[in-house]
Curated annotation (Swiss-Prot), chains A, B:
Matching Gene3D superfamilies: Aspartate Aminotransferase, domain 1 (3.90.1150.10), Type I PLP-dependent aspartate aminotransferase-like (Major domain) (3.40.640.10)
EC number of the protein: 2.6.1.9
EC primary class: transferase
Pfam families, per the entry: Aminotran_1_2
Name this protein carries in UniProt: Histidinol-phosphate aminotransferase
Similarity remark: Belongs to the class-II pyridoxal-phosphate-dependent aminotransferase family. Histidinol-phosphate aminotransferase subfamily.
Amino acid sequence: MKFNENLAGLVNYEAGKPIELVVREFGIEAKDVIKLASNENPFGTSPHVVEAIKSAASNAFLYPDDSYFELKEALGAKFGVGTKNIIIGSGSDQIIEFCLHAKANPQSAVLMAGVTFAMYEIYAKQVGAKIYRTRSQEHDLAEFLEIYEAHKDEISVIFLCLPNNPLGECLDTKEVYEFLKRIDEDVLVVLDCAYNEFAKFKDARKGIESSEILKFKNVIYLGTFSKAYGLGGMRVGYGIAKESIISELCKLRAPFNITTLSLKAAIEALKDEEFVTKTLENNLKQMARYEAFAREADIEFIPSYTNFITFKFDKQSASEISQNMLKKGIILRDLKSYKLNAFRITIGQSWQNDRVFEELKQNLK
Amino acid sequence: MKFNENLAGLVNYEAGKPIELVVREFGIEAKDVIKLASNENPFGTSPHVVEAIKSAASNAFLYPDDSYFELKEALGAKFGVGTKNIIIGSGSDQIIEFCLHAKANPQSAVLMAGVTFAMYEIYAKQVGAKIYRTRSQEHDLAEFLEIYEAHKDEISVIFLCLPNNPLGECLDTKEVYEFLKRIDEDVLVVLDCAYNEFAKFKDARKGIESSEILKFKNVIYLGTFSKAYGLGGMRVGYGIAKESIISELCKLRAPFNITTLSLKAAIEALKDEEFVTKTLENNLKQMARYEAFAREADIEFIPSYTNFITFKFDKQSASEISQNMLKKGIILRDLKSYKLNAFRITIGQSWQNDRVFEELKQNLK
């Protein structure tokens, strides 16, 4: 059977390894596995949210209120925007998909950083769009502008990952706003702010404000409940933009794109800012330990504005170290699929990080 | 901002009205609302599954095992197929999307019944494909073949909805297999079996067997946990086909397309066949009451092989009746968006149906 041409060039996203796999492959008990591979919240889910999910569990048979009325009202209040400026996705990933399916096509191109979130390219290829990347791995807006100017007739979508997954760096907000002014209003600029809570907490100059975003006719802010809000497994993300953008993206949203329990969980998660603050505080404190560890062990790292840190290797193989750690029940994220000799470690709780340091030491030469 | 051309022709799917809306608009308490609009399971979710969800609630922060290993093993055992013959979707809806994004394009056409599940057309339009429908509202394979033969060079996907939503009729399996033999191996035939458990229970001649499906190189079977398995709100569906089809569709599946709790719920739901049997038995028994009611009230209906029945009207307005019922807290599904003067009623529990009959009587002239 012949399939659409675009499929020929597609490869699947390589997800972080699940705990179940370590249990299956290495016979380690689930409770002894430390998963720091997928940037989930090391404190789990807020206990209030867990209770809310339990209370709503018997509604699993009911489709959700597809207007997502209550969630949009709550997000609208938090960000100071109207409900018509909000779209809900199955993770912010799905809104990335909507953006590309709405604006990119085989005649257009998509611009992104040299090394950035893999799903941008995957979705862009699904619609047959061309990809431009900056030479630098990290975001460099001068390079973005240079490529943009050279291929203005082609580029229909630009991605800025603020902060950048999987590297960790983050552009200054002021720079970003200046950049946005240079971009034609017909080009959609996606500000992927999945980790922006962490960046803003570390340094206010990295925080993207939705009120500023709504000044632009061609910019969308993406946020998620997967990281700081502790709901990675529930798949809820959101986009904030002018109504003229949101209403078009909504045409691509299938009904019931999040689950009934995800909807409930997200609404409850927004009420527990204390949990988020605890998460952000732990992250900052434990991040300092990783930096100190790396300096002492002479490992190259990128100062991170996220809830993970990426260690780069020169002589040793990062894949080999990751694999050794895996056998000990510690799951890190090998970045081989990003063509890097590096791995990414989610910042865990103190006791988890202790074990990481201990095992890592055994593996460093 | 200009968007891709395909978006111009798109309208959103009109979902069944949620309980929350009736509460908001008519001030009726949620506990007094009877929702028979979206073909959810009137017994809710199996108590065993509800318990499993509660036990897993604290895992909401963890991404699911993206291989869906355990669920695929369980489905494979149930259907007697390999795990590589299975793809998991966010509802079977999402697999409809994958099929169309993989096989349809602006140069191709999609063939379906005169009145059938709205998402086929919506997803087909997303990729700019042309739509052919049979003249008859219900499935008529002679008409399908006639159109297929006349537009063989264009048609890349054919949908058969077995049984058909929102009408309720169901083709005989034997007829379907004969039809499949007449279709070129490069055309993907999608057998949407979301309600097939109900059809098979009523009449064995309507049951589609996955072992038969795997004999064809170009056929995919779609099943769901939303109806007989009582998990509409959890969004889990599956496709079964030759590995050559599944592996291509998997290229379009984003990681973590179902939630951690949905995965758990689906695995547990497969273990409780008793709940499914109870559901099917109630459905058959209560369906007979709806048929008797319709005959007595002289309402036209299509004998249904699903968990709903569609009442067609001639003189009275189905929309008006639906709206009156809504004010009384009973949510039916007006089929105006399908261009029918009809409404669809999910077969409820006995006490729910009593109330429907009572209120309907007040509205019939």
